[in-house]
């Protein structure tokens, strides 16, 4: 009996003492309050990725479709651009939903970056990254307002539904962010990155 009690106590002490291994920060996530400049650079790289891929193929292709600049080949069931546009541009169609959702997914990432970067030490590098983030947010809203005219204006990260803003308010916000971007963007380094000259 004594051996069973000792074994039970030993097992319990091992289990209890090993619980602190779970109290460590995850290796694949960073608290918003402890983001370093190195972490910001990784998030910054993500902004370039999101800005390119989140609106989706449809987001970039919509302008060509609605402008009548794209025509299908001879084997198409749509004889002309207006027929195709009429069929594809319904509110329930993915050609409308996917870019809209993508623009706001991108906006969520941009706003998250801005909120974290504004709390960081304002080194030249951080200010330049903030300038690029403001540019991306202005570009995102430019795409939203030119395609949808009215949409929710999200200045901060939120998952709560927001009412639509007026077209004038959206354009004013685009201009506000472009002014911030002009004050902070880095000088030209390569054609692949946002710069003051671009």
Label the model's feature ranges.
Residues 7-11:
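Sec-dependent N-terminal signal peptides
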């Amino acid at each position: 009996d004594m051996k069973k009690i000792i074994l039970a106590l030993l097992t319990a002490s091992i289990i209890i003492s090993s619980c602190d291994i779970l109290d460590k920060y995850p290796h694949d996530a960073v608290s918003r309050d402890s983001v370093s400049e190195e972490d910001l650079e990784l998030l910054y790289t993500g902004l370039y990725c999101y800005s390119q891929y989140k609106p989706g193929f449809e987001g970039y292709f919509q302008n060509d479709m609605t402008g009548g600049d794209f025509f299908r080949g001879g084997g198409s069931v749509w004889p002309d651009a207006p027929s195709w546009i009429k069929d594809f541009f319904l509110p329930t169609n993915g050609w409308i939903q996917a870019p809209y959702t993508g623009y706001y997914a991108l906006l969520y990432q941009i706003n998250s970056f801005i909120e974290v970067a504004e709390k960081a030490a304002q080194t030249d590098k951080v200010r330049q990254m903030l300038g690029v983030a403001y540019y991306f947010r202005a570009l995102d809203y430019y795409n939203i307002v030119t395609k949808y005219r009215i949409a929710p204006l999200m200045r901060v990260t939120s998952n709560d539904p927001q009412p639509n803003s007026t077209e004038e308010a959206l354009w004013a916000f685009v201009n506000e962010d472009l002014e911030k971007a002009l004050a902070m963007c880095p000088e030209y380094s390569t054609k692949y990155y946002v710069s003051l000259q671009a």
